[in-house]
A protein has these predicted regions:
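ATP-dependent carboxylate/acyl-activation modules
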Residues: 1-201, 205-319, 329-331, 340, ...
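Catalytic core of bacterial c-di-GMP phosphodiesterases, primarily the EAL and HD-GYP domains
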Residues: 324
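Short amphipathic alpha-helix used as the core "switch/output" element in two-component signaling
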Residues: 336-337
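Short internal beta-strands
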Residues: 345-354
C-alpha cells in the first residue's frame, strides 16, 4: 500500500526524522490560511498523487509571494497530472502539500528496503540526490552505496557511520554525521515497526545551516502486515488506486491492470507471468495479471470474468490453468457457470493441464459455450492472439 508524501512525512516526524513544516491542503482558502500561518520566505506547493515525476509534470510550484499561494492551489487542485508513472490518462489532484522552502547545500538519496538476494533490510544511498535512482544505477552504478542490516541484531551505529563515510560526509559536512547516523536508526525503526516495504527520501538535503531535512518522502507498506496497523490503514486513499484492483482484493483475487488487450485468468503467480510472456511472444499484449489462486471456485472465476470484462481494452480472454491443488474439472464447472452469469462478448480460449484435465476439457466441449479449448500453451496463445486480430 502506498501513501501520499504528506503522510510519509508525518510518519517521518513521528520517528524523529527532520522534515519541513508543511500541511495537507484541499482548497484555496485553506491554502491562504496556512500560508499566513507558515509565514516563510519560500513556499512550496506540491500536488499529492501516488506517482513520481510530479515536478516535470508541473505538479510542484515554488513562490516567494504569500499572496500567490492560493492561486497556485487553485491551479493544481482538480488538475490531471501525466507523468512517466501515471500512464497516459494521468492522475487527478485532490490534495496538496504546502510547506516551507529550504536552503539546499547538497542533495543526497536514501532509501531502505528488503534486499531480495539476502532477505535483509538494506539501506541504499547515493550522492546523486534528486535524480531517478534507477538512472543512477544504470549509468553510474559505482555511485550506489548499500548497507545491509542483520535483522537478528538490528541497526547499529557502525551501520550508519559506514553509510555516512561512504557518502563522503566527513568531507561534505562533518557536522551532520552524528545526526545522519541517528536518522538512519530512526528510519530503520519506522521500517520495522510499521511493516514497511520501502522507505525513501529523495532528496535528503544538507542545508546551508548544516542540518538534514527530508525534502521529499515516500513510504510503501507490506499489505500482509496492514492488519496490525490501524493507523496505516486509515491512510489509504482509494482515489489513487485502480478500481478494478480494489474489486479484485474484495474477491480475494490478485489482479494488476496493464495496458494490453488480452485478459488473462491463471492460477499461480509464476504461471501468470509465463502466460503474459507467451502472449507477448505471440504478438499481442496482456491486459492484466490475474491470479485466481489454488482454491479457485465458481464464485472466484465469475468474479474474475466480471473484472476482466469491465476493462474496455479487453478484446479476448485467455484462461490458463494447471491443475495441481485445484482440479481442472472444478475450473471447467466454474467457467461454465460463470459464463451463464456473466455475458462473455469477446473470444475465449481455455487451456487446462494437470489433474482431471481431460474431464475438464470434455465438460467445456459439451457445454455449448462459444470458446476454444487448447492443450498446448503456445497453441493457446496463438489462438487468442489470432481471434483478437493481433497475430504477429
Amino acid at each position: 500500500m502506498n501513501v501520499h508524501e504528506f503522510q510519509a512525512k508525518s510518519l517521518f516526524a513521528q520517528f524523529g526524522v527532520p522534515v519541513p513544516r508543511g500541511k495537507e491542503i484541499t482548497s484555496p482558502d485553506a491554502a491562504t490560511a496556512w500560508a499566513n500561518e507558515l509565514n516563510t520566505p519560500v513556499f512550496v506547493v506540491k500536488a499529492q498523487i501516488h506517482a513520481g515525476g510530479r515536478g516535470k509534470a508541473g505538479g510542484v510550484k515554488i513562490t516567494k509571494d504569500k499572496a500567490a499561494v492560493a492561486g497556485l492551489a487553485k491551479e493544481l487542485i482538480g488538475k490531471t497530472l501525466v507523468t512517466h508513472q501515471t500512464g497516459p490518462k494521468g492522475r487527478q489532484v485532490h490534495r496538496l502539500l504546502i510547506e516551507e522552502g529550504a536552503n539546499i547545500a547538497k542533495e543526497l538519496y536514501l532509501s531502505l528496503l528488503v534486499d531480495r538476494d539476502t532477505g535483509w533490510p538494506t539501506f541504499i544511498a547515493s550522492t546523486e540526490g534528486g535524480m531517478e535512482i534507477e538512472e543512477v544505477a544504470a549509468h553510474t552504478p559505482e555511485k550506489i552505496i548499500k548497507e545491509a542490516i542483520d535483522p537478528a541484531v538490528g541497526f547499529q551505529g557502525y551501520n550508519g557511520r559506514n553509510v555516512a563515510f561512504a557518502l563522503g560526509l566527513q568531507s561534505l559536512e562533518p557536522a551532520v554525521i552524528n545526526p545522519f547516523v541517528k536518522m538512519l536508526g530512526n528510519l530503520y525503526r519506522l521500517f520495522m515497526e510499521k511493516n514497511a516495504a520501502l522507505v525513501e527520501i529523495n532528496p535528503l538535503i544538507i542545508t546551508k545551516e548544516k542540518t538534514l531535512i527530508a525534502l521529499d518522502g515516500k513510504v510503501s507498506f507490506d499489505d500482509n502486515g496492514l492488519f496490525k496497523h490501524e493507523d496505516v490503514q486509515k491512510m489509504r486513499d482509494l482515489n489513487e488506486e485502480e478500481p478494478l484492483e480494489i474489486e479484485a482484493v474484495a474477491n480475494n483475487l490478485n489482479y494488476v491492470k496493464l495496458d494490453g488487450n488480452i485478459g488473462c485468468m491463471v492460477n499461480g503467480a509464476g504461471l501468470a507471468m509465463a502466460t503474459m510472456d507467451v502472449i507477448k511472444l505471440a504478438g499481442s499484449e496482456p491486459a492484466n495479471f490475474l491470479d485466481v489462486g489454488g482454491g479457485a471456485t465458481k464464485e472466484t472465476v465469475a468474479a474474475g470474468f466480471r473484472i476482466l470484462l469491465k476493462d474496455p481494452n479487453v478484446k479476448g480472454i485467455f484462461i490458463n490453468i494447471f491443475g495441481g491443488i485445484v482440479r481442472c474439472e472444478r475450473i471447467a464447472h466454474g467457467v461454465i457457470e460463470a459464463a451463464k452469469e456473466v455475458k462473455i462478448s469477446v473470444p475465449l480460449v481455455v487451456r487446462l493441464q494437470g489433474t482431471n484435465a481431460e474431464e475438464g476439457r470434455k465438460l467445456l466441449a459439451e457445454s455449448g459455450l462459444k470458446l476454444d479449448v487448447a492443450n498446448d500453451l503456445w497453441e493457446a496463445a496463438q489462438k487468442i492472439v489470432k481471434l483478437t486480430g493481433n497475430a504477429a
